[in-house]
Curated annotation (Swiss-Prot):
Single GO MF annotation: 2-polyprenyl-6-hydroxyphenol methylase activity
Gene responsible for this protein: ubiG
Domain of life: Bacteria
Pathway the protein contributes to: Cofactor biosynthesis; ubiquinone biosynthesis
Designated name of the protein: Ubiquinone biosynthesis O-methyltransferase
Source organism: Cereibacter sphaeroides (strain ATCC 17029 / ATH 2.4.9)
Amino acid sequence: MESSSTIDPAEVAKFEAMAAEWWNPHGKFKPLHQMNPCRLDYITQQIAAEFDRDLSAPLPFEGLRLLDIGCGGGLLSEPMARLGAEVIGADAAPRNIPVAKLHAEQSGLTIDYRNTTAEALAAAGERFDVVLNMEVVEHVADPLAYLTACRELLKPGGLMICSTLNRNPKSFAMAIVGAEWVMRWLPKGTHDWSKFITPDELYDLIRKAGLDPVDRKGMVFNPVSWSWSLSTRDLSVNYVTASVRRT
């Protein structure tokens, strides 16, 4: 794997240590498993709208080349492959790749998993219709350089979906104190609150990277139903954005 200025070795090491847990819905990635239906709802709706696809079709994303950056064990890569996309999953943590490959094989899916970075793929001339950049930007050393590499990975007219965590007292209380210290859904230190990014900051970075932000929504956890939903108004903790490369 080529080195990159945006890769934070300490952040990679955190996820390396949890690699075997990816497909355990009750393990260390339980929050992602719970959030996944909400993430997939947003992703599929945005792709369908941008590329005029019918989600009721058997393979609505057939013909689209999709990159899942920070793919981990493949929680998003696999559903995208089932919808017909040609999927490349990239992760900077080497131990995640064999876990993802094995699960895809067991699921009868063809997914190209690679231990590489956004910068290395861009330098190699790889281009995609869709780039998924989910819960990654808060873990990199240089968000603007990273998002610029994501822009280079998109074909003109391509779509980037980016999700992250807002930075405010509520997100500290819920994502750090609640999720890591009290509920212990995640190991302590999984997130660094100082690296969280407000929606306005992210929009500014996306524009500076050369992309046009077109949508953003909150992803809100309901502790009563124990489920996640999209919100047009509440972006106070988790949120997701859609951006397009125009030229």
